[in-house]
Amino acid sequence: MQRVVISGTGLFTPSESVSNDELVVAFNAYVQNYNAVNAAAIADGSLTALAESSSEFIQKASGIKSRYVMNKSGVIDPARMFPHIAERPDAQIGIQAEIAVISAREALAQAGKTPADVDAIIVACSNMQRAYPAVAIEVQAALGCGGFAYDMNVACSSATFGLRNAADAIRSGSARCVLVISPEITSAHLEFRDRDC
C-alpha cells in the first residue's frame, strides 16, 4: 500500500483585522439604530430590544481579542456588518482561488515540490463564492498543474473529507501528489449583528 504523508502546508491570512473595540463601536451603533427604528414594536412587546456589547463581553465569551477579516470596512460599517466581496467575472480568477494559490505555493515550497509534481487538486470548503468555474480548476490553471481537480462541499467537515479523498487517491494509485486546499472566507460566515453569535 502506498504511504501517504502531509509533506507541506500553506496559510493565507487576510491583511486586515478587526479588534473587539472596533467591532463594539460598530455593533453598538447598529444596536442603537435597530432599537430606535423598532421603538414602537419594542414598546408593545412584539420585538425585543437588542443589547449592546463590550470588548470585555466578547473576550470573556470567546477568548477573542481580534480577528482577521476580508474587507474590514464592510464588517465595521454599522449599516452593513458583513464584508463586501465584489463579484469577479468568470474570466478573472476568483478571490477564493487567489487565496488558494497563495497557500498552495507556500505548501509546495515547504514540501519541495513544483506545480508539475501535482496531479490532483481538491478544493474543500463549506461555501463557494461562485458556482462556476470550479475553484480547483482555477487553481490548477493558475499554478500550471496537470491531472484532475474538483471542488467539494461537506459543510464544516469539508477539509477532513478533502484530506481523506486525497489519501484515498494516493493509496489507489490515481494520484501521486495531491493539493488539498480550504480557502474559507469565514468573515462572510459570521453574523456580526448578533452579539451571541
Segments predicted by a language model, with ranges:
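Acyl-thioester C-C bond-transforming condensing/cleaving domain
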Residues: 1, 15, 32, 46-49, ...
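Short acidic/histidine-centered micro-motifs embedded in hydrophobic/aromatic stretches
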Residues: 61, 124, 181
